[in-house]
């Protein structure tokens, strides 16, 4: 057993809130080689692979554009008060999309893609929670050349 180190006395834990009353959506940033950064938004979960129900906008994005993106998806009706469920916090979702777009633009030379999936949209007044996020850095950013 010589040379084997004991495990550290300190341990790290990640504790997260369990979200059970949110509606799953996704948002993603991708880079088109000709047109630049674009934002995709749609209903989350496995259904997006089947339904292809999403909206797409080139950046920059204003909050009004974000509301329009949300409204043009077929799944937008799920964000309304339906089947005894409260309405989702669409205003917070629109702000989330706008902040994501602003972040991508401010870091455009560093980012190729961003994927937020799922974003849990909570009942009105309670906001949104990003449950999983992935950022793919650009291989040849101006920051790396400096």
Annotate each language-model stretch with its function:
Residues 1-146:
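ATP-dependent carboxylate/acyl-activation modules
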């Amino acid at each position: 057993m010589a040379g084997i180190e004991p495990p550290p006395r300190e341990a790290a834990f990640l504790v997260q809130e369990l979200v059970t009353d949110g509606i799953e959506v996704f948002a993603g940033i991708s880079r088109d080689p000709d047109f630049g950064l674009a934002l995709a938004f749609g209903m989350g979960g496995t259904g997006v692979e089947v339904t292809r129900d999403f909206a797409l906008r080139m950046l920059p994005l204003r909050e009004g554009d974000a509301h329009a993106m949300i409204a043009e998806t077929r799944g937008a009706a799920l964000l309304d008060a339906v089947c005894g469920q409260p309405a989702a916090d669409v205003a917070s979702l629109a702000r989330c999309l706008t902040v994501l777009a602003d972040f991508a633009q401010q870091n455009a030379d560093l980012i190729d893609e961003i994927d937020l999936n799922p974003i849990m949209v909570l009942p009105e007044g309670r906001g949104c929670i990003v449950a999983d996020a992935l950022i793919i850095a650009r291989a040849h950013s101006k920051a790396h050349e400096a």
